[in-house]
Amino acid sequence: MVLAVAIGSLLAYPAAATSTSSVCDPDGVQPGGAIYRICMPSGSWNGDLVIYAHGYVPYNVEPLAIPENQLRLPNGTSLPELVNSLGFAFAATSYRTNGLAVKDGVEDLVELVDVFIYTATHGVPNHIYLTGVSEGGLITTLAIEQRPDVFDGGLAACGPIGDFHKQIDYFGDFRVLFDYFFPNLLQGDPISVPQSLIDNWPTYYATTIRPAILDPASADKVDQLLRVSNAPYISGVTSTIETSIYDALMYNVLATNDGIAKLGGQPFDNQGRVYTGSNDDAHLNLTVRRFSADQAALDEIEAHYQTTGQLTVPLVTLHTTLDQQVPYWHEPLYRVKVILNDSLALHQHNEVFRYGHCYFEAGEVLVAFLQLVSMVIEPPEPFPSPRQFLPMMAAGP
């Protein structure tokens, strides 16, 4: 009933019928160095603020800026215009750094609230809704858990919220497996990537890697790679196979060195991993390269990158079931944390049966957001979380 009322009230705004629903201030600079943008409805403002946390931007992208390509849904819908058309104010930040920006990102989002209130002089919003995608989904979840005094609720989409260390291992495992099936094709190794490869990644992929994986003679090796790595794809749809391979290798190439620097050590560890699904698992496990994580990196991840599932304000999550970058298994892992903290009443998850990373339709995003609004307007009563299915849910990837 509350959701129906929320939908009705949001759609009542006359600005929703216009295509010029946003009035954006010139971008500014936050005290910590991040770039911020604030967009207000061209019509009446409902007094609420939506803050957007964007996804990963490679560390070597310059200058620091809000990623414009992440301000639109796959169908071209503008997020600021969609939010403003419903009467909400919209604010976004670049974060103060590119690359791995999780720890700084939480601080930048809190700082952005102060910028909205005091620097832009819009005053204190009635409610502040935090939304984020991909890396921004993790930042959103951490901020909701850690700063309920600032944010009234959050929508975290396609983020690595279940286990950040497992996310790192997902990319690392894919790289060591790729090197096993396609030896000497990629320069460097899974934990040390040459700068020349980073600088020329798109060209190197197009001229060297892509022809190798699309060669009909490589079909069996590609099949084994996908089976062993558990990378999502749609059987028989070549474009999804190539996308899954490209994305996993891209993150290894572009994110590894930056991640090691910011985590204070090397986080990938496959010493005890048993790989299965190849034509010869015994040979694979005997000969695949093994790496050990640095304890300093693991400690940093545990301290600043792992979610707890302890909620005191609502969190709605949204994820495609065949997400090739941030696998869907993050959602049941996070759900286990929520159950263990008796926070189930404050967590609503929406699964989208589709291939692709953050590949949502506007209606799916809007429904998830309206669920969040309804939970904030009328907070659900807490209840003890059922634990009988925890062993099965905790199995993970």
Per-segment meaning from a language model:
Residues T18-W45, H283-S292:
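N-terminal cap/lid segment of alpha/beta-hydrolase-fold proteins
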Residues G43-N46, L112-S134, V150:
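Gly/Ser-rich "nucleophile elbow"/oxyanion-hole loop immediately N-terminal to the catalytic nucleophile
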Residues G47-V57:
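Short beta-strand element of the alpha/beta-hydrolase
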Residues N126-F182:
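Primarily recognizes the serine-hydrolase "nucleophile elbow" in alpha/beta-hydrolase
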Residues P160-Q306:
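Accessory cap/linker subdomain of secreted extracellular hydrolases
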Residues T317-H319:
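Short beta-strand/loop motif that positions the catalytic acidic residue
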Residues Q324-H330:
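Conserved alpha/beta-hydrolase "acid-adjacent" motif
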Residues L346-E361:
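Histidine-bearing beta->alpha loop at or near hydrolase active sites
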